[in-house]
Amino acid sequence: MFNYERPKHFIQSQNPCGSRLQPPGPETSSFSSQTKQSSIIIQPRQCTEQRFSASSTLSSHITMSSSAFPASPKQHAGSNPGQRVTTTYNQSPASFLSSILPSQPDYNSSKIPSAMDSNYQQSSAGQPINAKPSQTANAKPIPRTPDHEIQGSKEALIQDLERKLKCKDTLLHNGNQRLTYEEKMARRLLGPQNAAAVFQAQDDSGAQDSQQHNSEHARLQVPTSQVRSRSTSRGDVNDQDAIQEKFYPPRFIQVPENMSIDEGRFCRMDFKVSGLPAPDVSWYLNGRTVQSDDLHKMIVSEKGLHSLIFEVVRASDAGAYACVAKNRAGEATFTVQLDVLAKEHKRAPMFIYKPQSKKVLEGDSVKLECQISAIPPPKLFWKRNNEMVQFNTDRISLYQDNTGRVTLLIKDVNKKDAGWYTVSAVNEAGVTTCNTRLDVTARPNQTLPAPKQLRVRPTFSKYLALNGKGLNVKQAFNPEGEFQRLAAQSGLYESEEL
């Protein structure tokens, strides 16, 4: 670890700016032969805006041998041994470093004598340094290094020391670089390559800041101090090379097929789509947007399976559905046809007119007729006295048409056909029944009365008499005699009173 303690050979024998010399005489004395040890405390300044390279060092060795200091003059014969020349150190650390560093010729001017040489000039006569110069000697001015150059040298030294300390701390024993929390999170979110590109861009921006700072302090007076840009194993990346996020257009991996669903049933359309970023999905029915409501739901599972759900399929849901997936890179579309089978409206059977009770004679034929309305058409059951009637026989037949009219025909009716007849109509919506009575009577045996004898009077004699007598009509038709005959036959007699 670097030690900021000042070595013994860095002890300054004379302060050119702040030292005060007491006049020579019996009360003054030269410096003691013992060297005085002092330390320089330099507070490192945090520089967040400037970063220097990992290899920038100060190659100038700040060394000075003890022989560079002149020997202390002999004590005056009449001087007090307890008195010494005192030097007041009121100089800043930067000025002190400038005083001990070897001078450098200015790049824009002629060579300036070193400060150390000017501070420790000796006279040709061997006059001590601390002795007061004679009045005849010409006083030479002491050149001073500008403060901004001294400050730049100090900052370069401090930054180089800080870099070395941080470099040791960031390297592991196996030589791999320790990742910071930000780098770990960036690798987890963006991937190793993208994270490296991000931090490399940051390093390049920091290198540019360092170069800008170095250009401002280009007039440093330390010739061997050279600032180099940090080199990384990932290579140089320009600031203009921004991270290019990749986009992938939507692509349907799984699509549903055309389907036919009964009205009132549950329906579900599943599909899968890929793309980066995740595409937005929308549905259209015959060009109209499908809105999510109580009967229509759009969901996405954890595995990326999209679904369009119909809780209850209605007739209005039939049509061509178009699914559109869209993101920044593009869009994709697929269509599916949904056919809805209309639900049949069912209606329970109902008698339009019912069969009537009838009474027939044995040997006759009879028809029991009714009309039933129902959707779908019902099944019919005929019973006689709670027993099923056997159809399709020579005597009994059942007829039914599309209008719902039903006819039960019974031929050659006998006594066994009499009783209560029940007709039942049954379908999916319900059932209905109706009862009727059939009575059969025996045919009666009738006796015919004997025919009445009629007496017929012949009339040939009259016509013969007429024909024989000619025109004598009175003789041919005797009214009195005829009247008496009719009266005798009818039982009428002529009253004597008349």
From Swiss-Prot:
PROSITE patterns xrefs: IG_LIKE
Bias class Polar residues marks the residues at 77-138, 222-235
Q: Name one GO cellular component term.
A: neuronal cell body
Regions crossing the membrane: none
Cite the entry's keywords alphabetically: Actin-binding, Cell membrane, Cytoplasm, Cytoskeleton, Disease variant, Immunoglobulin domain, Limb-girdle muscular dystrophy, Membrane, Methylation, Muscle protein, Myofibrillar myopathy, Repeat
* Region feature (Disordered): 1-46, 64-151, 202-241
Where does the UniProt annotation place the signal sequence?
none
Per the entry, what this protein does is: Component of a complex of multiple actin cross-linking proteins. Involved in the control of myofibril assembly and stability at the Z lines in muscle cells.
Q: What is this protein called?
A: Myotilin
